[in-house]
Amino acid sequence: YTNNFKDRVSKIYLPKVDFLKKVIKSNINILDIGSGGGHFLKALEIRKINGFGYEPNFSLVKLGQKKMKKNKLINLDLKKTYKKVLENNKSNVLSLIGVLEHLDKPNYIINLFNKSKIKYLYISVPLFSLSTFLENSFDNVFPRQLSGSHTHLCTKESLNFFAKKNNLKVIGEWWFGTDFPDLYRSLINSSNSNLPKYKPHINKYLFSQIDALQSVLDKNKICSQAHMIFEKN
């Protein structure tokens, strides 16, 4: 996570910003909670979008501060960060990129958002999907979904319930998972085969079709990750 900062921003976080820009056509000003190393804030900066972030991990904040020229990343504990949501009067988007799944009480920050002056909510969350079953079966492979720091996973149904419960309108959604890449990773890392043909064969019969296979799950909204943008009704 802390390595290859520039590549991560370019390949992972710039697409998240571009998706946001496609959905919200007006000027965007971001309050980013749980900013980590500031990758999303840097991507915003590259796209000339103002962003202000808070992160409780001091080491990650130091990393992000070195990389940014305009957008700000501040080290602040979670309780004090929550107050910033209510106090904010400049931002029109609250972003929680890979954050809700780490919170013991995710509804708390959502309630603060509902009480705030911020109009839009942008989230990225892991989903209960094929990857979940793979991780449960290949317990020797590093888990992405069933990580010990994840308190819960979402589904299409739970996200729709979330929107209805909080009187939010879904104005943008991007379903894009890594289930089949996870399958490929699990098979490669768990194989006992020493045959030189093993990897070329699995590349031919799985990896070569990985995007097409993944698109089936993405289109049916049963993939491993979702990005959603909500607007207050």
Locations of the language-model features?
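Conserved N-terminal segment of class I S-adenosyl-L-methionine
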Residues: 1-89, 93-97, 107-111, 139, ...
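Glycine/Thr-rich phosphate-binding loops of Rossmann-like dinucleotide-binding domains
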Residues: 82, 104, 131, 181
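A short His-aromatic
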Residues: 98-102
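A short glycine-rich, Lys/Arg-flanked "PGG" loop and its adjoining helix->strand segment in the class I
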Residues: 107-121
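Short, glycine-/aromatic-enriched active-site segment of Class I SAM-dependent methyltransferases
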Residues: 124-152, 157-162, 186-188
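A SAM-dependent methyltransferase catalytic signature shared across enzymes that methylate proteins
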Residues: 158-174
